[in-house]
Each structure stands twice: as C-alpha cells, then as structure tokens.
Amino acid sequence: MIKGIGLDIVEINRLAHVLSRQPRLPERILTLNEQDIFHALSEKRQLEFLAGRFAAKEAFAKAYGTGIGRHLSFHDIEIQKDEHGKPFIKSEKTKDDQVHVSITHTKEYAAAQVLIERLSS
C-alpha cells in the first residue's frame, strides 16, 4: 500500500546563489557520508549533487508527510547508491517501509520523486 508520494524540483542557479551566501549549506543538508562524496567532486558536480540530494530529501519529507522540521531533519535522510549506481534512501524513519526514489537533473534544474510503500499492514 502506498503511504506517501513526494516530488521536488530545485533551480540549480538559485541554490548556487544561496551557497555563495551560506557556504556551510552542504553541512546543513548532507550527512557526513554524503559530505565526503560532495567534497570529492568538481565544483560543477558539487552543485548538481547538492541540488539532487536537496530535492530528494524534500521529496522524501513530503512523502513522509511532515516536511523538514521538528519531526524530520535533513540528517535523518541519507541518499546512497547501490552496486549499479541506482539511488536509494536510508532512514530510520522508514525502516519498515520500502522507499523508491528517482533523481534527475538538467543544466538548470534538479528534481526528485519519492514513493513510500508500506510493507506490512
């Protein structure tokens, strides 16, 4: 049974502008593991990576039903890749659920969709 669906889109240039004013933004959004990956990337790829992760975490928060705030933080959500490069979400908040995620980006935008599926009744 579907528990929630979330969708988010981020304008990459807008995120770049915020990042120029708030250089610690990646630390607010990314887990320590994600930060390690972020810092190993070129500057262009860093923006795409950060925008994609931000969109995925916002989409997850919408699917979860609370948004980012008191009950769910960016650090409660980690996007990892499987052995084939497919992204998946790791979160203690949905350990009994199946979470599906799709992340995409163009030169201008990053977008993500998340579906949370309840596995047990």
Swiss-Prot record:
Would you kindly state one Gene Ontology biological process term found in this protein's UniProt entry? lysine biosynthetic process via aminoadipic acid
> So what EC number does this one have?
2.7.8.7
Q: Which InterPro entries match?
A: 4-PPantetheinyl_Trfase_dom, 4-PPantetheinyl_Trfase_dom_sf, ACPS, P-Pant_transferase_sf, Ppantetheine-prot_Trfase_dom
Give the residues annotated as coiled coil. none
Output the Pfam families linked to this UniProt entry: ACPS
Q: What class of enzyme is it?
A: transferase
Residues annotated as binding Mg(2+) are 8, 58
Localization per Swiss-Prot or TrEMBL: Cytoplasm
List, separated by semicolons, the cofactors it needs. Mg(2+)
| Domain of life from the UniProt record | Bacteria
Alphabetically list the UniProt keywords.
Cytoplasm, Fatty acid biosynthesis, Fatty acid metabolism, Lipid biosynthesis, Lipid metabolism, Magnesium, Metal-binding, Transferase
One GO cellular component term of this record is: cytosol
The reaction(s) annotated as catalysed by this protein in its Swiss-Prot or TrEMBL entry are: apo-[ACP] + CoA = holo-[ACP] + adenosine 3',5'-bisphosphate + H(+)
GO molecular-function terms, A-Z = holo-[acyl-carrier-protein] synthase activity; magnesium ion binding
Q: What does this protein do?
A: Transfers the 4'-phosphopantetheine moiety from coenzyme A to a Ser of acyl-carrier-protein.
PANTHER family (UniProt xref):
L-AMINOADIPATE-SEMIALDEHYDE DEHYDROGENASE-PHOSPHOPANTETHEINYL TRANSFERASE (PTHR12215:SF10), PHOSPHOPANTETHEINE TRANSFERASE (PTHR12215)
Q: Which family does it belong to?
A: Belongs to the P-Pant transferase superfamily. AcpS family.
HAMAP family linked: AcpS (MF_00101)
This chain belongs to the protein called: Holo-[acyl-carrier-protein] synthase
